[in-house]
Amino acid sequence: MIKKTDLNNNIFQKEKQIRKEKLINMKKNGFSFPNSFKKNTNSIKIHQEYENKTINELKVLNVEVTIAGRMIQRRIMGKASFFTLQDMEGKIQIYTREKEITSDFYNNHFKKWDIGDILGIEGILFKTKTGELSIFSKKLKILTKSLRPLPDKFHGLSNQEKRYRKRYLDLISNNQLFNIFKNRSKIIRFIRNFMIENNFLEVETPMLHNIPGGANARPFITYHNEINEEMYLRIAPELYLKQLIVGGFERIFELNRNFRNEGVSARHNPEFTMMEAYIAYSNYEDMMNFTENLLKNIIKSICGKSEIKYNKYYLNFNIPFKKLTMKESILQFNSNICLSDLKNLQKIKKIANNIGIEIKDNWNIGYIENEIFEKTVEKNLIQPTFITEYPVEVSPLARRNDFNSNVTDRFELFIAGYEIGNGFSELNDSEDQKNRFLNQMKIAEKEKNKDMLYDENYIEALKYGLPPTSGLGIGIDRLIMILTNQISIRDVILFPTLRSFKK
């Protein structure tokens, strides 16, 4: 018995061969892939300008158009045919007939073209008897021959792995996905424009670092042949950006890629887009206000409303974002824990063990508190919420709080259970920063972590004086997930990280 998959594969291979032979014959008859094709419009402009015109109005207007795109559907009805052309903006129906383009061209060329071929069209706008806006083609030209049948001809591109690996096919056949990435571009453009309009200067810092720094993450290691040294793809631009604040810039941002040699999940991709911003002479509360304003403006501009649906939740951006300290949030979502438990090492260890947290030897109260928060609280932070007062132990670059030296002037923004942003008042005491770096080195040595290195150049820069400064980092991919209602980060990254095809 022949399996359905084998049958489909046989049909696919046969069609590949037929298309290849068609191209060979086309080349024998003088076809060469054209160098260009001048369009004067696209599908969305046509629909926007002429959708409301009547049949008679279009006859009077006699609108000539030149358009190009991919043929994705076709109905041949003897001496006349309808087909659908898809371009970047949408779709438009094309009508052609033997009388207009000659019998020879219609029968020996057009009818032998395939779904997936890229065509250039010149024609006149009209409406069919059913009222569908269409183009009556006077000239047809094949621009590119498709040698592979499109996936929707064989029930779509349903395999998730293939969707990511052959993103171009997914984009051709999935209009919803195509629009997600158009919206991604709009969101990034809006953020960039918003920052510039708020007097931020966009800067660029190195992607290749001599020392990994700016975040506690495992780096990708590469090698520079000329200088004969290992280098690291950046895990964060933070330390370079703060050196620019030392140098005199007061409002800067960078919107670019970071790389972290860590796990892949619905919320994590090793290569991801971040925006980091810094404001001199401000503190973390100022940056929280700025972050809330930025997010509300993005939602209003991109979504056109202040309440949006994400997964099964309705997210309200119309009200002030909620604010909780880390301890307050743990108590709120853990009725069996009281405040005194979080201040006692033995009690907090017992709580952590009871919920399955594996405690490392060097962990003190701050580390354990953060682990309890991540395990029991984060997933419950659905509406936009700022969490503040992070322990010093997990915030090595943040300024200590004036009233409690065990916590920092730091916040993280959570939406729909995802960490979207991280910000704080920057630590500008060079001695305190040096001691924290050295403490990190001791811990890394015990854990045999060779990726944690001491950044002497950054400490040297701090000694020249970093003004009071607040910083912010926003995970752009996660934000886009929420704005486009996607549950996997892979569905908002055009080419997510995958194993090599052979593996």
Curated annotation (Swiss-Prot):
Binds 3 Mg(2+) ions per subunit. GO terms for cellular component: cytosol. It catalyses: tRNA(Lys) + L-lysine + ATP = L-lysyl-tRNA(Lys) + AMP + diphosphate. One of its GO terms (biological process) is lysyl-tRNA aminoacylation. One of its GO terms (molecular function) is ATP binding. Its cofactor is Mg(2+). Its EC number is 6.1.1.6. Keywords: Aminoacyl-tRNA synthetase, ATP-binding, Cytoplasm, Ligase, Magnesium, Metal-binding, Nucleotide-binding, Protein biosynthesis. Mg(2+) 1 binds at residues 412, 419. It is found in: Cytoplasm. The keyword Iron-sulfur does not apply. Mg(2+) 2 binds at residue 419. SUPFAM superfamilies: Class II aaRS and biotin synthetases, Nucleic acid-binding proteins. NCBIfam families: lysS_bact, PRK00484.1. This is Lysine--tRNA ligase.
